[in-house]
Amino acid sequence: MLDQRAREQYFADGFLTVPGYVGTAWLDRLHAVVTAKIEESRALAESDDQFELAPDHSAEKPNIRRLRKAVDQHPELWAFAQDPLVVDLVADLLGPDLRFHSSKLNFKWSDGGDAVGWHQDIQAWPHTNFGVLTFGVYLDDTGPEQGPLTALPGTHRGTIFDQFNDDGRWTGAVVARDVATLRTDTARELCGPAGTVVLLDCRVVHGSAANFSPRMRPLLLNVYSAADALPITPTPAPTTKTGVLVRGQEPTHVHMEPYPGRLPPRWDQVGYRSIFAAQTTAARPAWVD
């Protein structure tokens, strides 16, 4: 798993890349799922509970933004999410007892796949402590031209920013006046060959540029928490596996830390679509290089 130097880098930066960590056997299985889901999407004219489609999606030219609640959409995706290859790596950072939280597969389609503005994850699903991270794996080689995940080192140790606009609407993005306070010149593009894993602290500020290359950038994202980190508010996109213990033992006590951020909307009452919808309908800020 991770050596001490890698662990220290994660805790210092708020993120870590592990190049080529997922091998060919799993990548082939995951690619088979992607191919099947693209074919399935051709029958749709608009987004549904499984697929978030781009406005120009068609049967002839599919354009999928996201496979929602990925572990519920194919058995292979749940098998991967609980594989020791995955959960043992996460345990190196969060401890031996782990709970599954949520899952999505972002496609970032070729020739203009959406940019995502600077944001932090924890505001959408605050927990009783910050022992929560995202495990992302690039299914294909991903370089700067594909719009890789990009993070601002050290921001996980700073402010939990407000992600509502002045009208009180959830934007899923750090507002412009707060972006102006960030050292965006320190941004690191998290690139790597197929199978590269990106681990993101729940507080680190990150985003991604648009993909103007001729290849899509499929990225499977699973969120895990330490078993003693419990959600404070309803989960925006709960799966049938949300809250399932995937490693170790159930805790006897909850771990509590102060949460200084603003609480998100009541997703169980207002509904949740995605970060793409939130940033678009709330006048998404331009990508900041």
Question: What annotation goes with each model-predicted range?
Answer:
Residues 40, 52, 197, 204-289:
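Non-heme Fe(II)/2-oxoglutarate
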Residues 15-17, 134-138, 151, 187-189, ...:
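Conserved hydrophobic/aromatic beta-strand scaffold that supports enzyme active sites
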Residues 96-103, 114-116, 131-137, 147, ...:
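Generic beta-strand structural signal
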Residues 26, 109, 143, 158, ...:
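Feature marks short, surface-exposed loop/turn motifs that line or immediately flank catalytic pockets
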Residues 119, 126-144, 191-192, 199, ...:
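Short, conserved beta-strand element in jelly-roll/cupin
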Residues 8, 142-205:
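Double-stranded beta-helix
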Residues 1-13, 19-118, 123-126, 164, ...:
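Non-heme Fe(II)-dependent double-stranded beta-helix
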Residues 51, 120-121, 173-184, 216, ...:
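Short, surface-exposed loop/helix-turn segments at secondary-structure junctions
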